Design a protein with these regions (language model features):
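Disordered, acidic Ser/Thr/Pro-rich linker "stalks" and the adjacent N-terminal cap
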Residues: 48, 816-867, 877-884, 905-909, ...
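Structural beta-strand segments of beta-rich domains
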Residues: 715-719, 859-861, 870-872
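Short solvent-exposed strand-capping/beta-turn motif centered on an Asx-Ser/Thr pair
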Residues: 709, 724-730, 866-868, 879-881, ...
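Trp- and acidic/polar-enriched beta-sheet ligand-binding modules for extracellular glycan
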Residues: 880-942
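Glycoside hydrolase catalytic-domain context in secreted enzymes
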Residues: 16-779, 790-798, 802
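Beta-strand-rich interaction surfaces with strong enrichment in secreted/lumenal proteins
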Residues: 755-761, 785, 850-854, 903-906, ...
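Short strand-edge motifs at loop-to-beta-strand transitions and within beta-strands
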Residues: 757, 765-771, 859-863, 912-916
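Bacterial Sec-dependent N-terminal signal peptides
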Residues: 1-23
């Protein structure tokens, strides 16, 4: 609530200080120089002729080359730099006559965070008049765009970039949970909706490029930016990253720029020395964990932007590495967009890494490596002028410059900047940004991100009718700052946990509130290693909370972290609750009243005492502006929590690195017997494992089936199972599928995530699920660092977490030579036709159930199909005298006697003609193979 008041005062002050044009924002935007704007095209170079690059119907690459040929070196190099927006580097909110004399008179590649109101890092409060409403903001960005279109020689539009990992970073926009919270929803469709809304609101505000998603994989829970990752599984990060990019880039509304490439999130000891140096990983670990998400998101979602990181890997700074930015990113992954540096990454080549002697050498290294656009908090001259000097001196070829500029122009063409450079629907911006439908998705995300960690004796949900007095305390109970951090909306209305509870219980219960303690104490972080006594003021505040708890029916304690303890450059040396939070919790627990602990934080915390003594615990991460409403719904049973952990909770910081996936037995050691005479020397096991999360209801897993059970490396198998809600409440279950390679040429992971689905079931409802297992789940990097699928057995495990496996089965992969030999060794098929096998033909094609062909395990019957027939299902009536379950396979052949399995399963029902579908294939012969004895086929229909 407080931020709305601040925003009103801010805008009121701006009205007095700044000249505002127009006085009233129009409903639509129409540029002034109408002679440039022709019917169906724009005369960007003002020559009166429709050049190829100005023709929307011309091929993309032809438009790029036509424009590139017309550009001077000065114009090309200006495209290779970002200009930070108002109050960052740019001192003007709107274009001034001086702009025609500055560097960007020749254009600019991108302007970042312009007029978005960002105020961090000691900058003065935003005093621009264009921060809100959305229509006025869009109008202002249009005016800036108009300078580049109308007042530069070639009229190349600027790419307006902005942050957006939890909603677009504008003063007002739809505010979602932090990306770590979004990961805990495990909901692909929801993540796509988040991307769609973020991209749509960004474009309506005037932005064309969103720096999202974060594709870093969390591996060290101490790391400050842990709040920004989806989780610690590369498969999950890739799956959600794909959906986020598809949403953002829907209809090319904006470009999505994933970050940070590469090997960024595992710096030594989680320390952040600005350059994020010395990540501790083997080459194979980098590929399996950190490169995997980027590779899949680029290939499967067509991501148009990548931000290069400023760490080194094995002594080579990524931002200066041709191997990473060109050989791998473009050559192997097929990336076709542009690479922008993280802020100051180019400078770090000589100021931090020491691999360049000066700025000019740093520029050369980065551009030769593959960098397209440099981003920094300094004037663009500091990059562009050395770049021009290098070309003129022969230190860089202009062809390298051309290659880099081609990528930049390609993105600008793809997102429509040369066809529609302005956001013309200004009134639409006011309708779209923060509209009711978007806010509903934000609330859904807040609901689905919450994880129930403990619920002893079913304390939750609370009965709103019998709970008459509620004590609420904790530093995060009435805090809203967690929803207003960098990289997302800055001044939205936030419902705190206290406000959510008060609104939910209005007229039904009395809510007693006191803070209890601050987020950290005066000595923090030193107090993590030295036990300072409580001050009188600290003790008095805890005493107030205790007195409230004694009067109440239940105490709700809201603890965790915030901007002081987590975020960029805020890594920790401990995972314990900071400050006096544990002492507050222990004092409340000592009252004997039921206690519910809510955690609002950006990283897993080692809450061992709470796990042992507090009956109910909810993990909410940073739940967005709707977090208080969502948590109140969960506390009182209006929503059943269904989030699952995408990260591991260690019991102690001494276990780190401790994460998923891991190598066999790598996270367990030190003996098994505790005590003075035992051999246990350290704490083992996770406090809460990857995939863990409880519910107010229960779920049963059954009927696992894997057809076919034998495949070749390039074939796929389907895993089927059934999940039933066996409880009394409707709820969500995140069904997880894991895979383990039983025998391999290198050490592989103990288990790896291979699939997941979030489903909603009413009480008693059952749902059949299917997962596809294909090459991406089976391959490994062999001893020669080549991706291969090795023949052998793979165990497939379905369950409610990585440690709560309910069902398992085995899939076998055989190589092509083994398959060919097996086919050749098979006995001749019993071909059914009227001429060669009249008895079989009569028995299975006479449309009579009471006549049948019978076989035993390994027997098969083959049917000749019409030449070139396409078959996608077969109806079969099986019978068996003992009615025991039986399995079978359907195989097809295109000729030459080689058959491939297209269906493997269990007989659904005896004595009835049942249809068994499979992927449609053209074939000449069809075979049914029995896997059990004394099974009869009474009838077959194609």
């Amino acid at each position: 609530m407080k931020n709305l008041i601040a925003l009103t005062l801010l805008l009121g002050g701006s009205t007095l200080l700044c000249a505002q044009k127009p006085a009233k924002t129009p409903a639509t935007y129409k540029p002034v120089k109408s002679e440039m704007y022709r019917k169906g095209w724009i005369d960007f170079n003002k020559n009166g002729v429709k050049d190829v690059y100005e023709d929307p119907s011309a091929p993309l690459e032809a438009r790029i080359e036509n424009l590139l040929q017309q550009m001077t070196l000065d114009e090309k190099t200006c495209q290779m730099v970002t200009l930070y927006g108002y109050k960052r580097v740019l001192k003007d909110d709107l274009p001034t006559p001086e702009w025609k004399e500055l560097l960007w008179k020749d254009g600019i590649g991108a302007i970042d965070e312009h007029l978005n109101g960002f105020q961090q890092w000691g900058l003065p409060p935003s005093d621009n008049a264009y921060v809100w409403p959305a229509s006025r903001h869009a109008w202002a960005l249009n005016e800036v765009q108009r300078f580049f279109v109308e007042d530069t020689r070639l009229g190349i539009p600027v790419d307006f970039t902005n942050e957006g990992i939890r909603g677009v970073e504008s003063y007002r926009a739809t505010n979602f949970p932090t990306q770590l919270g979004l990961g805990h929803t495990w909901n692909r469709e929801l993540i796509r909706q988040v991307g769609l809304i973020t991209g749509r609101e960004a474009r309506m505000l005037g932005y064309t490029n969103v720096y999202a998603p974060i594709l870093d994989v969390g591996r060290d829970q101490r790391w400050g930016r842990y709040e920004e990752v989806y989780g610690e599984s590369p498969y999950l990060v890739a799956e959600l990253g794909i959906e986020m990019v598809r949403g953002l880039q829907h209809n090319h509304q904006v470009a999505a720029t994933g970050k940070h490439f590469a090997a960024y999130s595992n710096n030594k000891g989680a320390r952040e020395g600005m350059a994020r140096v010395d990540p501790q990983m083997s080459p194979r670990e980098v590929e399996n964990i950190h490169i995997y998400p980027f590779k899949r998101v680029i290939r499967e979602a067509g991501m148009l932007g990548v931000m290069s990181s400023y760490n080194d890997y094995d002594g080579i700074p990524v931002q200066g590495s041709y191997y990473w930015l060109t050989t791998r990113l473009r050559g192997e992954m097929g990336f076709r967009g542009y690479v922008v540096s993280d802020s100051d990454a180019v400078e770090y080549l000589y100021t931090k890494h020491g691999t360049a002697k000066d700025m000019k050498e740093a520029v050369r290294q980065s551009v030769e490596a593959g960098l397209n656009v440099r981003c920094t908090f300094r004037s663009p001259d500091s990059f562009v002028l050395p770049l021009r000097e290098l070309v003129k001196e022969g230190g860089l070829s202009e062809e390298v410059i051309n290659d880099r500029v081609r990528d930049i122009l390609r993105v600008k063409f793809l997102i429509g900047l040369f066809d529609a450079p302005y956001q013309t629907d200004l009134a639409g911006a006011d309708r779209e940004v923060e509209k009711e439908e978007n806010e509903a998705i934000a609330l859904q995300a807040s609901h689905e991100s919450v994880v129930l960690l403990k619920n002893a004796d079913e304390l939750l949900p609370l009965d709103i009718n019998s709970t008459k007095k509620i004590a609420v305390c904790g530093p995060n109970a009435n805090e809203e700052g967690y929803a207003l951090t960098h990289y997302g909306p800055l001044a939205v209305e936030v419902t705190t946990v206290l406000e959510g509870i008060q609104e939910k219980t209005k007229g039904k219960a009395e809510v007693l509130y006191t803070k209890g303690c601050d987020l950290v104490d005066a000595h923090w972080p030193e107090s993590e290693i030295i036990d300072y006594p409580l001050t009188d003021d600290e003790q008095a505040e805890i005493d107030k909370a205790v007195e409230n708890a004694r009067q109440a029916d239940v105490a709700i304690v809201v603890l965790g972290g915030g901007q002081r303890t987590c975020g960029e450059n805020k890594s920790r040396t401990s995972l314990d609750l900071p400050g006096r939070q544990l002492q507050l919790l222990q004092a409340i627990q000592a009252t004997g009243k039921p206690v519910v602990l809510i955690l609002i934080n950006g990283r897993p915390l080692s809450i061992n005492w709470a796990d042992k003594f507090v009956p109910a615990i909810l993990e909410a991460w940073y739940p967005g502006s709707k977090g208080g409403t969502a948590l109140a719904d969960i506390l009182f049973g209006d929503y059943n929590p269904g989030g699952k952990l995408t990260v591991t909770f260690p019991k102690t910081v001494g276990q780190i690195p401790f994460n998923f996936p891991c190598k066999p037995s790598s996270q367990i050691d030190g003996g098994k017997n505790p005590g003075p005479t035992g051999n246990m020397s350290r704490i083992n096991g996770a406090l809460y494992p990857f995939g863990y999360g409880l519910s107010y209801t229960t779920f049963e897993y059954s009927d696992l089936d894997i057809p076919p059970r034998v495949i070749t490396p390039n074939e796929s198998a389907t895993v089927r199972l059934k999940v039933t809600n066996t409880g009394k409440r409707a709820g969500d279950e995140v069904v997880q599928l894991y895979i383990r390679d039983v025998l391999s040429s290198i050490t592989t992971y103990e288990k790896n995530l291979a699939g997941f689905q979030r489903i909603h079931l009413e009480p008693g409802e059952a749902q059949e699920l299917s997962f596809t297992i294909d090459r991406k789940h089976l391959e490994l990097l062999d001893a020669d660092m080549k991706w291969v699928v090795e023949p052998g057995d793979f165990v497939l495990m379905a369950g409610a977490s990585s440690e709560d496996i309910r069902l398992n089965g085995t899939l076998t992969v055989e190589d092509y030579q083994t398959r060919a030999k097996a086919i050749e060794a098979q006995k001749p098929a019993k071909r059914v036709s009227a001429s060669t096998n009249p008895e079989d033909a009569e028995n299975v094609l006479d449309e009579k159930i009471n006549t049948a062909w019978q076989g035993n395990k390994g027997d098969y019957i083959t049917f000749a199909l019409k030449n070139g027939a396409k078959v996608d299902k077969v109806a079969i009536a099986f019978t068996r005298d003992n009615n025991l379950p039986a399995t079978f396979e359907i195989q097809l052949s295109g000729g030459g006697g080689q058959f491939l399995t297209v269906y493997s399963g269990t007989v659904s029902e005896y004595g009835k003609l049942i249809s068994y579908p499979f992927k449609g294939t053209t074939a000449s012969d069809l075979r049914i193979v029995l896997n059990d004895d004394r099974v009869s086929i009474a009838e077959v229909k194609f």
